[in-house]
């Protein structure tokens, strides 16, 4: 049996119009009778009244009543809609605590909902991820997890592994039992390979969709005065970098974040790369090379008819295995008959960069955000990758001649990882760690 908990669910901004205080537990209706002047409402009803401390009125409120177990938390819950601000909210909290509740830990309402069987960990984490979404695409991806299709997919994998494990154990412990399928190599290997294929596809889709949650680093490199800082400013639509006609103006890396089609990028405007005897400028050039190594996308900015030198070749060499985009700047100064169709031309100073933006996004298109097999949550993705590794180890073991009683260890590990994605109520340490990252009142 849980105790009674309370928290502000709407945050605690100083000047917000409304504050929502949530209570949950076995005695919350009785607590409300002590401090609320209105009627105790029926399930899913709203009543009007005042919150009082002894006979002193604290606030005029609307109270929403939710009888357990048919609500989010799965137990009696009350939500008080009070006037906003820290002072009034704090007074109401103190009054509730004085009458038999305690302050909730972060995520404790969601944790109770999980323990009461109202949601699994996939949906619980989707709620938290939705709250912390930074882009529209992130929010769309997270809300899709509410329909439980991802959970159903994981549970289907779990059930297939349960069948394999159960059959293996019967074959090991009761080899004389005739009513169960004999798991020979010819039977077990295809089943595991089918599972490997399913999980591999989920991991592949998940890795691709991570672009909407990770920051993709882009290094803008090239010679001095080719327009790198102007390009950074054009992409950001603001003046972040200093732009002059003096070569070597940028001597350190200037970083800025921007979102393009819902994808987060980290732009890095680097020092111009050339031969220099200036000690400070040489340090900046070395940093430019380092940024090429550390970035996923390299925008190599050049001018028309620019000859390739040793530094240009080094940029290309360091860009091997990365997305390399060669861009010709100052398009407005080039006659139309000299523009080639297979090249990307821009005018950074005039903000004419649409062709470059298309090139940046090219490899990140055609991702189906509705695919329920996609897993973006870091904890869940690590677990499904671990389960895939264990299944691959089991397959490898069988192909090397090991018997089912040996590889069942790897198969069981794969099952445990998948079970921990949707959640196990007996793993208290996991639950405490996960729900502690939630907001107060959630």
Swiss-Prot record:
Protein task: Exhibits a very high intrinsic GTPase hydrolysis rate. Involved in the addition of a carboxymethylaminomethyl (cmnm) group at the wobble position (U34) of certain tRNAs, forming tRNA-cmnm(5)s(2)U34.
**Cofactor note (record):** Binds 1 potassium ion per subunit.
PROSITE patterns listed in its UniProt record: G_TRME
Where located?
Answer: Cytoplasm
Q: Name the domain of life this protein comes from.
A: Bacteria
Please give the cofactor(s) recorded in the UniProt entry for this protein: K(+)
Record: residues binding GTP = 225-230, 244-250, 269-272
What organism does the record attribute this protein to? Answer: Mycoplasmopsis pulmonis (strain UAB CTIP)
Q: Where is the TrmE-type G domain?
A: 215-365
Q: Which residues bind Mg(2+)?
A: 229, 250
Q: What GO cellular component entries does it have?
A: cytosol
Q: What does the entry give for GO biological process?
A: tRNA methylation; tRNA wobble uridine modification
Question: What name has this protein been given in UniProt?
Answer: tRNA modification GTPase MnmE
Q: Which enzyme class, named as a word?
A: hydrolase
């Amino acid at each position: 049996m849980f105790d009674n908990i309370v928290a502000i669910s709407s945050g605690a901004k100083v000047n917000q119009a409304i504050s929502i205080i949530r209570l949950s537990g076995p005695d919350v209706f009785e607590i409300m009778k002590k401090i609320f002047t209105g009627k105790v409402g029926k399930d899913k009803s709203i009543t009007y009244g005042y919150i009082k401390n002894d006979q002193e009125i604290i606030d005029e409120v609307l109270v929403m009543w939710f009888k357990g177990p048919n609500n989010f938390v799965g137990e009696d819950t009350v939500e008080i809609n009070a006037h906003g601000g820290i002072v009034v909210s704090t007074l109401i909290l103190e009054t509730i605590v004085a009458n038999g509740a305690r302050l909730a830990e972060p995520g404790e309402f969601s944790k109770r909902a999980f323990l009461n069987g109202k949601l699994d960990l996939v949906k619980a984490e989707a709620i938290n991820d939705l709250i912390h979404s930074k882009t529209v695409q992130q929010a769309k991806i997270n809300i899709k997890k509410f329909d439980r299709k991802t959970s159903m997919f994981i549970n289907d994998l779990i059930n297939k592994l349960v069948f394999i494990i159960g059959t293996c154990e019967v074959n090991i412990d009761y080899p004389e039992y005739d009513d169960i399928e004999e798991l020979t190599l010819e039977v077990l290997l295809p089943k595991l390979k089918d599972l490997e294929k399913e999980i591999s596809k989920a991991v592949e889709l998940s890795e691709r969709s991570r672009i909407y949650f990770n920051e993709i680093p882009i290094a803008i490199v090239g010679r001095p005065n080719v327009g790198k800082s102007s390009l950074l400013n054009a992409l950001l639509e603001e003046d972040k970098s200093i732009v002059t006609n003096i070569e070597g103006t940028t001597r350190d890396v200037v970083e800025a974040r921007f979102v393009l089609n819902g994808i987060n990028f980290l732009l890095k405007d680097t020092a111009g790369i050339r031969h220099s005897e200036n000690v400070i400028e040489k340090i900046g050039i070395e940093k430019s090379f380092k940024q090429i190594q550390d970035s996923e996308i390299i925008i190599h900015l050049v001018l028309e008819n620019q000859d390739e030198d040793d530094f240009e070749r080094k940029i290309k060499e360091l860009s091997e295995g990365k997305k390399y985009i060669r861009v010709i700047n100052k398009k407005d100064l080039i006659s139309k008959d000299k523009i080639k169709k297979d090249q990307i031309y821009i005018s950074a100073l005039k903000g004419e960069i649409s062709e470059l933006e298309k090139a940046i996004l090219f490899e990140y298109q055609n991702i189906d955000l509705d695919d329920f097999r996609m897993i973006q949550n870091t904890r869940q993705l690590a677990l499904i990758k671990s389960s895939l590794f264990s299944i691959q180890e089991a397959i490898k073991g069988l192909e090397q001649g090991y018997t089912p009683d040996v590889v069942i260890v790897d198969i069981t590990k794969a099952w445990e990882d998948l079970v921990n994605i949707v959640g196990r109520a007996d793993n208290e340490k996991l639950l405490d760690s996960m729900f502690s990252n939630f907001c107060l009142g959630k």
